[in-house]
């Protein structure tokens, strides 16, 4: 009722309302809100909705049987950050404060992010916190365990636990190959299934942006050190 009154006031003044929601999840509250939003649209209020979240959470919300109207909304997939942009950003940040880093080390830390925005921020923070005036490969190796642990704890564990058993089996087969880019045929063989069967899980993991198609018939992890995480998780749990 309050939202409708607000929308009515803005409409009379010739104004529109944009509502933004971050880190969406298919909760009862969000489903209720989405229903109210749909009703406001039907009543021709000038209102728009912008939501952001992990790909699997967005898919879950769009596929809710009560919220199928969301399937008509425009979905924008965020691409990984450009490695060149990451490299330039690191260089500027360190040089601005008089801290040096050679090109080889700069390339090393850039590749360690794999274009993942959170990894870019986290790695930069951990290196900055060392207070070293020269960022060397030795400094990078020193913070590497902490970098991996933070990725695992803050992001990867929750992502992994929300996957289906077959999705887990798929990425486990990928991690066991030891290759950066893995043939789908090899994954199917490890899962003792044909390629048509596992294509469902391949498609789902692609939609969730956990893997990417690197070349015809091959896939790779999108997240840095994700294969290492899977192996460690399997060992510990």
PLM regions: where:
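Helix-loop-helix "sensor" segment of P-loop NTPases
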Residues: 57-111, 132-135
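Conserved Walker B catalytic segment
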Residues: 1-55, 63-66
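Short, glycine/charged-enriched secondary-structure capping and boundary segments
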Residues: 32-36, 64-68, 92, 226, ...
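C-terminal leucine-rich, beta-strand-based interaction scaffolds used for sensing/assembly
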Residues: 42, 104, 149-237
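Amphipathic alpha-helical "lid/sensor" segments that cap RecA-like P-loop NTPase cores
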Residues: 91-154
